[in-house]
Protein backbone atom coordinates (compact mmCIF):
# COMPACT_ATOMS: atom_id res chain seq x y z
CA UNK A 1 0.00 0.00 0.00
CA UNK A 2 1.56 3.31 -1.12
CA UNK A 3 -0.76 5.68 0.75
CA UNK A 4 -3.36 5.85 3.51
CA UNK A 5 -6.59 6.71 1.69
CA UNK A 6 -8.45 7.85 4.79
CA UNK A 7 -7.15 11.42 4.44
CA UNK A 8 -7.70 11.67 0.66
CA UNK A 9 -9.70 8.66 -0.63
CA UNK A 10 -9.69 9.83 -4.27
CA UNK A 11 -7.53 9.39 -7.37
CA UNK A 12 -8.65 12.79 -8.62
CA UNK A 13 -5.94 15.47 -8.20
CA UNK A 14 -6.72 18.64 -6.29
CA UNK A 15 -6.13 17.89 -2.62
CA UNK A 16 -7.43 20.92 -0.67
CA UNK A 17 -4.60 23.16 0.52
CA UNK A 18 -5.78 23.00 4.12
CA UNK A 19 -5.15 19.24 4.26
CA UNK A 20 -1.41 19.90 4.01
CA UNK A 21 0.68 20.92 6.99
CA UNK A 22 1.72 24.47 6.11
CA UNK A 23 4.43 26.98 6.95
CA UNK A 24 4.05 30.53 5.65
CA UNK A 25 7.78 30.71 4.89
CA UNK A 26 7.66 27.65 2.62
CA UNK A 27 5.76 27.86 -0.68
CA UNK A 28 2.93 25.57 -1.67
CA UNK A 29 1.61 25.07 -5.17
CA UNK A 30 -2.04 25.93 -4.66
CA UNK A 31 -4.79 23.42 -5.39
CA UNK A 32 -6.10 24.78 -8.70
CA UNK A 33 -2.62 25.49 -10.10
CA UNK A 34 -1.51 22.04 -8.99
CA UNK A 35 -4.32 20.35 -10.93
CA UNK A 36 -3.32 22.09 -14.16
CA UNK A 37 0.40 21.44 -13.63
CA UNK A 38 -0.29 17.74 -13.06
CA UNK A 39 -2.42 17.56 -16.20
CA UNK A 40 0.44 19.04 -18.24
CA UNK A 41 2.73 16.21 -17.05
CA UNK A 42 0.34 13.51 -18.35
CA UNK A 43 1.28 10.99 -15.69
CA UNK A 44 0.49 7.29 -15.80
CA UNK A 45 0.67 4.36 -13.42
CA UNK A 46 4.28 3.29 -12.97
CA UNK A 47 5.89 6.57 -14.08
CA UNK A 48 9.06 7.91 -12.49
CA UNK A 49 8.95 11.60 -11.56
CA UNK A 50 11.34 14.26 -10.25
CA UNK A 51 10.02 17.31 -8.36
CA UNK A 52 12.63 20.09 -8.15
CA UNK A 53 12.01 22.64 -5.39
CA UNK A 54 9.39 20.46 -3.76
CA UNK A 55 8.62 22.90 -0.93
CA UNK A 56 5.60 21.76 1.07
CA UNK A 57 5.38 18.63 -1.07
CA UNK A 58 1.96 19.18 -2.60
CA UNK A 59 3.08 18.37 -6.16
CA UNK A 60 5.20 15.42 -5.00
CA UNK A 61 2.32 13.90 -3.04
CA UNK A 62 -0.24 14.40 -5.81
CA UNK A 63 2.19 12.94 -8.37
CA UNK A 64 2.88 9.96 -6.10
CA UNK A 65 -0.85 9.21 -6.00
CA UNK A 66 -1.09 9.42 -9.79
CA UNK A 67 1.86 7.08 -10.51
CA UNK A 68 0.71 4.53 -7.94
CA UNK A 69 2.62 1.86 -6.11
CA UNK A 70 4.68 0.87 -9.15
CA UNK A 71 5.86 4.45 -9.74
CA UNK A 72 8.21 6.68 -7.80
CA UNK A 73 8.69 10.38 -7.07
CA UNK A 74 12.03 11.96 -6.21
CA UNK A 75 11.39 15.17 -4.26
CA UNK A 76 14.38 17.55 -4.19
CA UNK A 77 14.78 20.70 -2.11
CA UNK A 78 17.86 22.52 -0.82
CA UNK A 79 16.06 24.14 2.13
CA UNK A 80 16.28 22.09 5.33
CA UNK A 81 13.01 23.51 6.69
CA UNK A 82 11.21 22.60 3.47
CA UNK A 83 12.59 19.07 3.67
CA UNK A 84 11.36 18.74 7.26
CA UNK A 85 7.89 19.98 6.27
CA UNK A 86 7.85 17.67 3.26
CA UNK A 87 8.62 14.71 5.53
CA UNK A 88 5.71 15.71 7.79
CA UNK A 89 3.30 15.82 4.85
CA UNK A 90 4.54 12.52 3.43
CA UNK A 91 3.89 10.96 6.85
CA UNK A 92 0.51 12.70 7.10
CA UNK A 93 -0.65 11.14 3.83
CA UNK A 94 1.22 7.87 4.53
CA UNK A 95 2.87 8.01 1.11
CA UNK A 96 5.52 5.32 0.57
CA UNK A 97 6.61 5.94 -3.03
CA UNK A 98 8.38 9.28 -2.51
CA UNK A 99 12.14 9.49 -2.06
CA UNK A 100 13.17 12.75 -0.38
CA UNK A 101 16.50 14.24 -1.46
CA UNK A 102 18.04 17.19 0.41
CA UNK A 103 20.45 19.31 -1.59
CA UNK A 104 20.98 21.55 -4.61
CA UNK A 105 19.16 20.09 -7.60
CA UNK A 106 21.90 21.29 -9.96
CA UNK A 107 24.32 18.99 -8.13
CA UNK A 108 21.86 16.13 -7.59
CA UNK A 109 20.15 15.86 -10.98
CA UNK A 110 23.14 14.50 -12.96
CA UNK A 111 23.19 11.37 -10.79
CA UNK A 112 19.42 10.79 -10.80
CA UNK A 113 17.83 7.98 -12.86
CA UNK A 114 15.98 8.68 -16.08
CA UNK A 115 12.36 9.66 -15.47
CA UNK A 116 9.12 10.23 -17.34
CA UNK A 117 8.33 13.68 -15.95
CA UNK A 118 10.06 16.56 -14.18
CA UNK A 119 8.36 19.35 -12.26
CA UNK A 120 10.36 22.52 -11.59
CA UNK A 121 8.83 24.69 -8.89
CA UNK A 122 11.97 26.50 -7.83
CA UNK A 123 15.27 27.19 -9.56
CA UNK A 124 16.94 29.75 -7.31
CA UNK A 125 17.38 32.25 -10.14
CA UNK A 126 18.95 29.63 -12.44
CA UNK A 127 15.92 28.63 -14.48
CA UNK A 128 17.66 28.32 -17.86
CA UNK A 129 20.35 26.01 -16.50
CA UNK A 130 17.88 24.11 -14.31
CA UNK A 131 15.66 23.27 -17.27
CA UNK A 132 18.64 22.17 -19.35
CA UNK A 133 20.00 19.90 -16.60
CA UNK A 134 16.54 18.54 -15.71
CA UNK A 135 15.93 17.57 -19.33
CA UNK A 136 19.03 15.36 -19.31
CA UNK A 137 17.11 13.08 -16.93
CA UNK A 138 14.01 12.89 -19.14
CA UNK A 139 13.34 9.85 -21.27
CA UNK A 140 12.22 10.31 -24.85
CA UNK A 141 8.60 11.58 -24.79
CA UNK A 142 9.10 12.60 -21.16
CA UNK A 143 7.57 15.89 -20.08
CA UNK A 144 8.83 18.87 -18.11
CA UNK A 145 6.47 21.25 -16.29
CA UNK A 146 7.65 24.56 -14.82
CA UNK A 147 5.50 26.79 -12.63
CA UNK A 148 6.55 30.30 -11.68
CA UNK A 149 5.15 33.71 -10.81
CA UNK A 150 8.08 35.52 -12.47
CA UNK A 151 7.98 36.53 -16.14
CA UNK A 152 11.78 36.41 -16.22
CA UNK A 153 11.71 32.77 -15.13
CA UNK A 154 9.12 32.03 -17.80
CA UNK A 155 11.37 33.61 -20.42
CA UNK A 156 14.39 31.62 -19.23
CA UNK A 157 12.41 28.36 -19.22
CA UNK A 158 11.10 28.99 -22.73
CA UNK A 159 14.56 29.86 -24.05
CA UNK A 160 15.97 26.64 -22.61
CA UNK A 161 13.12 24.55 -24.02
CA UNK A 162 13.50 26.02 -27.50
CA UNK A 163 17.29 25.74 -27.42
CA UNK A 164 16.94 22.06 -26.49
CA UNK A 165 14.52 21.44 -29.34
CA UNK A 166 11.69 20.35 -27.07
CA UNK A 167 8.27 19.78 -28.61
CA UNK A 168 4.70 20.70 -27.66
CA UNK A 169 5.93 23.80 -25.81
CA UNK A 170 3.01 25.43 -24.02
CA UNK A 171 2.56 28.48 -21.78
CA UNK A 172 -0.55 28.84 -19.64
CA UNK A 173 -1.32 31.68 -17.26
CA UNK A 174 -3.54 30.62 -14.38
CA UNK A 175 -5.54 33.30 -12.59
CA UNK A 176 -7.64 32.02 -9.71
CA UNK A 177 -10.10 33.91 -7.54
CA UNK A 178 -11.57 32.27 -4.44
CA UNK A 179 -14.90 33.07 -2.88
CA UNK A 180 -14.99 34.63 0.59
CA UNK A 181 -18.18 35.05 2.58
CA UNK A 182 -18.84 38.59 3.80
CA UNK A 183 -21.82 40.07 5.63
CA UNK A 184 -23.70 40.97 2.45
CA UNK A 185 -22.85 37.89 0.39
CA UNK A 186 -19.81 36.34 -1.28
CA UNK A 187 -16.92 38.22 -2.86
CA UNK A 188 -14.07 36.87 -4.99
CA UNK A 189 -10.48 37.38 -3.82
CA UNK A 190 -7.91 37.11 -6.61
CA UNK A 191 -4.64 35.25 -6.13
CA UNK A 192 -1.36 36.01 -7.89
CA UNK A 193 -1.24 34.81 -11.50
CA UNK A 194 0.93 31.72 -12.03
CA UNK A 195 2.68 30.80 -15.26
CA UNK A 196 2.87 27.12 -16.22
CA UNK A 197 5.34 26.21 -18.97
CA UNK A 198 5.43 22.66 -20.28
CA UNK A 199 7.11 20.73 -23.07
CA UNK A 200 7.97 17.24 -24.28
CA UNK A 201 11.37 15.76 -25.04
CA UNK A 202 11.57 14.30 -28.57
List where the protein language model places each region.
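Class I SAM-dependent transferase core
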Residues: 1-50, 81-93, 188
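Glycine-rich helix-loop-beta junction characteristic of Rossmann-like nucleotide cofactor-binding loops
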Residues: 39-44, 65-66, 136
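Conserved S-adenosyl-L-methionine
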Residues: 53
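Conserved SAM-binding loop of SAM-dependent methyltransferases across substrates and taxa
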Residues: 56-69
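Short beta-strand element of Class I
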Residues: 70-74
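S-adenosyl-L-methionine
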Residues: 76-114
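Short SAM/SAH-binding signature in class I
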Residues: 114-122
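C-terminal substrate-binding/active-site "lid" region of AdoMet-derived donor-dependent transferases
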Residues: 133-195
Amino acid sequence: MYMDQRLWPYRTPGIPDDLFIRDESIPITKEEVRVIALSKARLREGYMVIDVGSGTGSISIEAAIQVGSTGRVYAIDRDADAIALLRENVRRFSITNIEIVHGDAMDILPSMPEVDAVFVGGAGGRMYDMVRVACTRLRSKGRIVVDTIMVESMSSALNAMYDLGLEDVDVTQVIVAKGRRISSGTMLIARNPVLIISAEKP
